[in-house]
Structures are given as structure tokens and as C-alpha cells.
Amino acid sequence: MGCSLYPQGYPAIVNQLRDFKGTNLLADIGNGTMNILYINNKKAQESRCWTEKLGVNQCMIAAKNAVLDKFGVKIEESTVEQILRFGTADISAPYLDCISSIARQYVAELFSTLRKYEYNPDLMRLYVVGGGGCLIRNFGTYDKSRVTIIDDICATAKGYESLAYM
């Protein structure tokens, strides 16, 4: 019996590899970290794989602190989560604007970090898995034809299943 090891996020896209051409970048944006992996001609480049402490929780903390600093009140984490996941919540506009501004800054930081690792949307496609995809979709400025957000929460499990039968 053998054991296979795969870079973080890779199983989530394994069923889509047939569509990959040229250079692609995978960003797995989870709660605590963003894992970055280059995939060239359908092959993971393990030597071009990095982890940044830039997970969704950093955005959550920043949003809650911004509301506390600006309005002097604590906001429920579930309310902030609603905004981050769906882009809105049933709260007054000043609070929504405050949190949305933080989310836009966070997404800008995500893209800045990707550029640090030579991400160029003109030269490659970006695939995003994990909870951070919601933030990019709701608060990011990007070319939708060059960025694929995989929001299937079962994508990783499906990928591992496929890998088990390869």
C-alpha cells in the first residue's frame, strides 16, 4: 500500500486539470492561510508552492476591529461572516460600508501577495479554492474571464476520491 502527498488545494482542482493550459496559479484561501501553487501544463510545480498567513480570519478580525474603532460597538461575528460570504447583511449602511471597505482592502492585499509570487493575469489563469473565494467574488476587482472561483465545498473530497482511483 502506497501513500501519496499533494500540495494544499491541489485535490480541489484535479478534476479540472484537463482544462488547464499553459501556466496556472492556484490559491487556496482558508481560514488561517493562503496556499499558492503554480501548475504548468497540468503538472503541479512543488518547487513553486508557498504559504502566506493571510487567511479569511485576518479579514474577520480587521472588520470587527474597524467597527469597534469607528463606532465604539462590538459586532457579532456571524454578521461579519454574512457580509463576507454574501456581500451584504441586514444592518445599516454605515456599518456595512465600514466592513465592505475592510473586505476590499483585504482582497487587494490578497492580489498584492499573489503578484509578489509573479502572478500576472495577462499571462496565466488564477483558480481560487477555499472560503476566500467569496471575498474575491464580492469585493474584488479582477478579470472574471481569467479567474475561476471554485465554490464547491466538496471539491477537495471529490478530488481525493479521483486521485485514489488514478
Regions found by a protein language model. Give the residues of each.
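Gly/Thr-rich phosphate-binding beta-strand-loop-beta motif of the actin/hexokinase/Hsp70
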Residues: 17-45, 63
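Conserved ATP-utilizing enzyme core subdomain
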Residues: 54-76
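Nucleotide/phosphate-binding catalytic cleft detector across ATP-hydrolyzing
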Residues: 1-24, 45-58, 78-166
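Short hydrophobic alpha-helical module
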Residues: 12, 39-42, 66-73, 113
